[in-house]
Regions:
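Phosphate/NTP-binding elements of NTP-utilizing enzymes
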Residues: 1-202
Length: 202
């Protein structure tokens, strides 16, 4: 929650597996965006295959939250994407980065946060042509003219376990050398921020 209160649009949280990154991000989106403000969230993975897996009970990203809090938040496949439901109420959507071209006409006026889970590819995964540019296109699709209309920008919250400083997103945002220096110092959590970017290594 405190990271979003900075109003910085691009937030990257990188750390070891099992540190609660996805859990905390989704719980905050549900409590703050959905319940408090009647808004929706957009959950994203790199590939369509990863997104489809989320629709199974085993890989539902809300699985542990449901268990811990007695919720019933379920993803359902819908026309090439997925939607998240709390009972019968749609509370969010899901998209793969590889499907960005399919949703450029999407109207996401009711969405204030994009949660990009596992944004750094695993070592064994293939590189994606135009990965960072596709992400920028998606952000523009969701954000549109909000700031011109007097609204705060959409928050793009990116989460990852893999610690590859030379990933496509860091290269695009000119964060490679910054992340490498943070890692060399070896003091965690480590944080870097400016007006548009916040990077937290844990």
């Amino acid at each position: 929650r405190s990271m979003r209160e900075t109003k910085i649009p691009f937030i990257m949280l990188v750390g070891g597996r099992g540190t609660g990154k996805t859990y905390s991000a989704l719980l905050d989106a549900y409590l703050h965006d959905v319940l408090e403000n009647g808004r929706k969230f957009l959950y994203m993975r790199r590939t369509k295959e990863q997104l489809k897996m989320c629709c199974s009970d085993k890989y539902n990203p809300f699985r542990k939250i449901n268990h811990d809090r007695g919720y019933n938040i379920r993803p359902k496949k819908e026309a090439g994407t997925i939607s998240f439901y709390d009972g019968d109420t749609q509370i969010g959507g899901g998209i793969a980065l590889t499907s960005v071209d399919d949703v450029k006409s999407m109207d996401a006026f009711d969405t204030d946060i994009i949660i990009y889970d596992e944004f750094i590819k695993a070592r064994s995964a293939r590189r994606m042509k135009g990965e960072a540019e596709n992400l920028a296109d998606l952000y523009e699709t969701v954000n549109r003219n909000r700031e011109l209309e007097g609204y705060p920008p959409v928050t793009l919250l990116m989460l990852a376990n893999a610690n590859d400083s030379a990933n496509a997103i860091f290269v695009y945002l000119k964060l490679v050398s910054i992340a490498e220096k943070m890692q060399v110092k070896g003091k965690f959590p480590a944080i870097y921020r400016n007006d548009t970017r916040l990077l937290l290594l844990i």
